[in-house]
């Protein structure tokens, strides 16, 4: 989605970033453990950076697969691609920090799943997000704990903010992610309790590796 270091390289105790994924995939291609191809989509700044970092950080026995079996594909604002038999439209979220894309995916039912990126929703996303079936939106912390975590200073929102947004956009299913983890054992319960006061649809706060069926 964008070039912030925690997403490109991965940081300790967080989900590993895209550079680490490229390394592992190419490593397994080289050893014969990874069959087939893989395609990574991103805007021009991200794709250029991935090319450069991979060439500088990874050995040639791994980078030789880039452009051959591992494809780094540039996409533009409002561009639609067919991915796994689904029409996916990429869009610029209007970030003031770094160029960043979200996407809208057409589901088999004809309805849409929309991912808003790593920052709070901007009005420029409305043509994609309004009335979608599934909305994926970040929520850094509870609104009741905003003074503790300072989400707005980090260009993030709260559970209350995301839920009010989903209600306003007439979204039936809301998935919250990119949350703090200080009280991870009780996060689902606490976030659900706050969110249900502002959102009447189905609210999901998934744990790591939890699956959600989307149709």
Positions of predicted regions on the chain:
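Binuclear metal-dependent hydrolase catalytic cores
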Residues: 1-114, 120, 125, 189-215
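Cap/insert and terminal regions of metallo-dependent hydrolase folds
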Residues: 120-210
């Amino acid at each position: 989605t964008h070039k912030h270091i925690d997403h490109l390289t991965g940081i300790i105790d967080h989900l590993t970033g895209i550079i680490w994924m490229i390394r592992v995939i190419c490593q397994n291609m080289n050893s014969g453990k990874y069959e087939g191809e893989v395609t990574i989509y991103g805007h021009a700044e991200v794709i250029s950076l991935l090319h450069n970092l991979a060439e500088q950080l990874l050995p040639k026995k791994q980078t030789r697969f880039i452009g051959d079996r591992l494809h780094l594909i540039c996409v533009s604002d409002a561009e639609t691609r067919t991915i796994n038999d689904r029409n996916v439209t990429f869009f610029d979220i209007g970030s003031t920090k770094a160029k960043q894309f979200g996407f809208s995916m057409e589901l088999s039912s004809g309805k849409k799943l929309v991912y808003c990126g790593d920052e709070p929703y901007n009005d420029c996303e409305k043509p994609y997000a309004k009335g979608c079936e599934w909305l994926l939106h970040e929520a850094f912390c509870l609104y009741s704990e905003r003074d503790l975590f300072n989400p707005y200073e980090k260009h993030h929102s709260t559970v209350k903010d995301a839920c009010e947004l989903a209600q306003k956009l007439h979204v039936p299913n809301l998935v919250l992610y990119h949350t703090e983890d200080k009280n991870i054992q009780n996060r689902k319960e606490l976030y659900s309790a706050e969110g249900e006061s502002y959102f009447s649809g189905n609210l999901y706060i998934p744990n790591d590796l939890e699956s959600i069926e989307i149709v």
